[in-house]
Regions:
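Sec-dependent N-terminal signal peptides
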Residues: 6-8
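C-terminal motif of bacterial Sec signal peptides marking the signal peptidase cleavage site
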Residues: 12-15
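Sequence-level detector for tyrosine residue identity
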Residues: 37, 45-49, 67, 97, ...
Length: 183
């Protein structure tokens, strides 16, 4: 009798709809991924971690998305976000940056889902103001150049399953100063 109860309990547990039994959500997008960004919000957080490094974030929007007066995103398109870009300057200097988790100069953080909060480097696919898909990037680089046409950003990013994503931005780089509370 104990064996029957044990087997029934095991069958019950295995058949439950738990995260263990659900297939993982793929990290590669199923929707079109825009790769040319037309609007940007550059944010400066100062020496946010008290590590003698300036911390920045870049929020990029593809055509179809826009910021409202409070910098909330609306519309349909792609939003590429990079947080925790580390430099020793008061702005993001020209050069090559690598995705890293060490918080060294000329690096930026990989995408992470930390207890339900998405941070680091990620892509949101937005349709009619609703997030349809999230892509976390695990490795890659960013090249920054300044020209007569403004700031030029070139991204070579990879997901956990090695899916490649190339994106660019060319335009102004106006910085907003943010506090620790506003991150």
């Amino acid at each position: 009798m104990k064996h029957i109860v044990f087997i029934l309990l095991l069958v019950f547990l295995v058949s439950c709809d738990s995260p263990i039994n659900r297939p993982p959500i793929p990290n590669t997008p199923t929707l079109k991924m825009d790769s040319i960004y037309t609007a940007a919000d550059f944010r400066s957080y100062g020496d946010y971690y008290n590590a003698n490094l300036q911390v920045f974030a870049i929020d990029l929007l593809s055509e179809g998305l826009a910021y409202d007066s409070t910098f909330h995103i609306s519309g349909s398109g792609c939003n590429l976000f990079l947080s925790d870009i580390f430099t020793t300057c008061d702005s993001i200097p020209a050069g090559h940056y690598e995705m890293d988790s060490t918080a060294k100069k000329m690096t930026f953080l990989r995408g992470m889902n930390f207890e339900g909060n998405i941070t680091g480097t990620y892509l949101l696919q937005i349709s009619e103001d609703n997030i349809q898909h999230i892509v976390l990037f695990q490795s890659g680089s960013m090249d920054v150049k300044y020209t007569d046409q403004g700031t030029h950003l070139d991204f070579k990013l990879y997901t956990a399953d090695s899916t490649y994503y190339h994106a660019t931005y060319q335009g102004p780089s106006k910085y907003r100063i943010k506090s620790r509370k506003e991150k």
